[in-house]
Design a protein with these regions (language model features):
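C-terminal transmembrane helical hairpin of 12-TM major facilitator-type secondary transporters
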Residues: 335-381
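C-terminal ends and interior cores of transmembrane alpha-helices
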Residues: 99-117, 343-359
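Central cavity-lining transmembrane alpha-helices of secondary-active solute carriers
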Residues: 68-83, 307-320
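Helix-loop-helix hairpin linking two adjacent transmembrane segments in secondary transporters
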Residues: 162-215
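Hydrophobic core of transmembrane alpha-helices in multi-pass small-molecule transporters
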Residues: 104, 117-137, 362-376
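A late C-terminal transmembrane helix in Major Facilitator Superfamily
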Residues: 317, 386-423
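Cytoplasmic helix-loop-helix junction between adjacent transmembrane helices
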Residues: 127-166
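Extracytoplasmic gate region of multi-pass secondary transporters
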Residues: 45-47, 258-318, 378, 382, ...
Length: 461
């Protein structure tokens, strides 16, 4: 009988000199794929919005409310999803999340097949609301996985890569969804994305495990992660050996929530993320409609043009993470290494206002691309969450951050709908979006001081 020795079972001195595995990058690749589908599902309505409005006679204000349905549910479900993540872990909760949001996306393909137009509008609102609830654990789970699998000096790049999936989704899926809508009808967009997501949920369960439990991880990689600040032990601490309640589940009480909400640094981070997401939700909801209505593009052309700023956003997102981690490796403080890309990138994104002063379609796309590039550079909020979240409450902390950030998904689509409906143009809407970028700069320069991990006080201390 042959004895096989796992790399993790090697003597300590041999394990340290052994070439470390790179399983964390495969986990990051999985996060990227899941987040890409996540954002593709969010963007379905922006691509199919024009034919849906025409089919059911929906006015701009009503469309704004339908756009916001996702975010109403997404925000309300954040704290419960944070508790679930800290109680049961990212692997199981995220798998359930992927399956459910994909099932609800699939159900949207049946809207309008029977009943009145009013019923179809109500059903669309309800299904978007359900998708919002199901997707709520996604980004807090991403942050929890990154905090567990990556050391501090790699965390900015890892967070930027999974966050850049939103732009990659626009690059790949916006033209694809526009083509499906043009060639086969908008119902097919929801049908095929829903089926793809159901399959992905089972793949996630098969591939993703906690660092300490993954059979392909050797001791050298575990030590690299843990000694660099990765919370490899926290990923499994939430599960007791007999299923008893853990520290991760006990922390989800209002006593701890109040501590997080009273922290000046976190308040500034929450405000900044809200304003960043105003730009995000403009691109996710109204941007294709802006290109069709204000710039006279066809739906198919708008779908392809949407991908160009998204490419720039993707490149900016990866560059921002690499720049931040590069500064840390060169001895720059964590605070400056995170703030420099965020402040610089969001200042650059204000060029979106310039679209009000040009007539050329080419210049509009260029300005939007520069704005999206800046937003990508500045989208390091999830790296900041991984840097600052209390070790025993990463899921809860990420959920609070995501809850405040995605309040913009409620406010921005409705506000833009009113601005467009009242004025008949998108000029005021673009100023509104650009000013939110300015508030992000203010928040990180004035409100957020030192960026550091929060230490919670416990009642029995």
């Amino acid at each position: 009988m042959t004895n096989q020795t796992s790399p993790r079972d090697l003597p300590l001195d041999l394990a340290r000199t052994a070439r470390r595995t790179a399983v964390r990058y495969w986990i990051l690749a999985m996060l990227f794929v899941v987040t890409t589908l996540n954002y593709a599902d969010r963007a379905t309505l922006s691509i199919t919005g024009t034919p849906i409005r025409q089919a059911f006679g929906i006015d701009p204000v009503t469309m704004g409310y339908i756009f916001s349905a996702f975010s109403w549910a997404y925000v309300l479900a954040q704290l419960p999803s944070g508790w679930l993540l800290d109680r049961f872990g990212a692997r199981r909760v995220y798998a359930a999340s992927i399956f459910l949001w994909s099932a609800f996306t699939l159900l949207q393909s049946t809207i309008g097949l029977g009943g009145s137009a009013a019923f179809a509008v109500a059903a669309l609102f309800a299904m978007r609301f359900a998708v919002g609830i199901a997707e709520a654990p996604a980004f807090p789970a991403n942050a929890k996985v990154v905090a567990s699998w990556f050391p501090t000096a790699e965390r900015g790049t890892a967070s930027a890569i999974f966050n850049a999936a939103q732009y990659f989704a626009a690059v790949v899926f916006s033209p694809l969804m526009a083509w499906l809508t043009h060639a086969y009808g908008w119902h097919h967009v929801y049908l095929w994305l829903g089926l793809a997501g159901v399959a992905l949920a089972f793949l996630w369960l098969r591939v993703v495990k906690d660092p300490a439990d993954h059979p392909a991880v050797n001791r050298a990689e575990l030590e690299h992660i843990e000694q660099g600040g990765g919370l490899v032990r926290s990923a499994t601490a939430a599960r007791g050996s007999n299923g008893s309640r853990s520290e991760g589940s006990r922390v989800a009480g209002w006593y701890y929530v109040r501590q997080l909400l009273s922290n000046r640094m976190l308040i500034g981070v929450y405000l900044g993320q809200y304003c960043v997401n105003v730009l995000t939700y403009f691109f996710l909801t109204w941007f294709p409609i802006y290109l069709v209505q204000a710039r006279g593009m066809s739906l198919l052309k708008a779908g392809f043009m949407t991908s160009l700023p998204a490419i720039c956003g993707f490149l900016g997102g990866v560059l921002g993470g690499m720049l931040s981690d590069g500064l840390i490796r060169r001895g720059v403080s964590l605070t400056l290494a995170r703030k420099i890309p965020i402040v610089g990138g969001m200042a650059l994104s204000m060029v979106i206002i310039g679209c009000n002063y040009v007539d050329s379609e080419v210049l509009v796309i260029v300005l939007m691309a520069v704005s999206f590039f800046g937003k990508g550079i500045g989208s390091l909020g999830w790296a900041v969450v991984a840097d600052t979240a209390p070790k025993e409450a990463i899921g809860l902390s990420g959920s609070l951050f995501n809850m405040f950030g995605n309040t913009a998904g409620i406010v921005a689509p409705i506000a833009i709908g009113y601005l467009v409906g009242a004025s008949g143009s998108f000029n005021g809407a673009l100023v509104f979006v650009g000013l939110n970028a300015l508030v992000t700069v203010f928040s990180y320069l004035v409100i957020v001081k030192d960026i550091k991990r929060v230490e919670l006080r416990h009642r029995d201390a």
